[in-house]
């Protein structure tokens, strides 16, 4: 392998690392060791794996058909459903999952309202 091709490959790797910022990727981090629940300080604690303030949710929300349902907190929703299926006798065990899903949805709709107040379009006709 020539030196020039090695340099090109290294540059591509560096570019990919830079492009993996939260705004450019929709990847859900599933490895618990890599999730930063306290990103930005104590006031920004995050108790769910989804990223409801990602800019891509706005476009998916506006591009969905009127009769379709879009959930930006899909992973939290699925976790709460799985907990209910595991603990059918006692739903109080799943309260943390319910709260995380509710918080995720609240963050998503707060982002939506904030974008509208700032005059940012893209949320559909409403």
UniProtKB/Swiss-Prot annotation:
A motif (Cx9C motif 2) lies at residues 94-104. A motif (Cx9C motif 1) lies at residues 73-83. It is found in: Mitochondrion intermembrane space. GO terms for biological process: mitochondrial cytochrome c oxidase assembly. SUPFAM superfamilies: Cysteine alpha-hairpin motif. One of its GO terms (cellular component) is mitochondrial intermembrane space. Residues 70-112 form the CHCH domain. The keyword Transmembrane helix does not apply. Residues 11-29 have a biased composition (Basic and acidic residues). Disulfide bonds join 73-104, 83-94. Keywords: Disulfide bond, Mitochondrion, Transit peptide. Required for the assembly of cytochrome c oxidase. Belongs to the COX23 family. PANTHER family: COILED-COIL-HELIX-COILED-COIL-HELIX DOMAIN-CONTAINING PROTEIN 7. This is Cytochrome c oxidase-assembly factor COX23, mitochondrial.
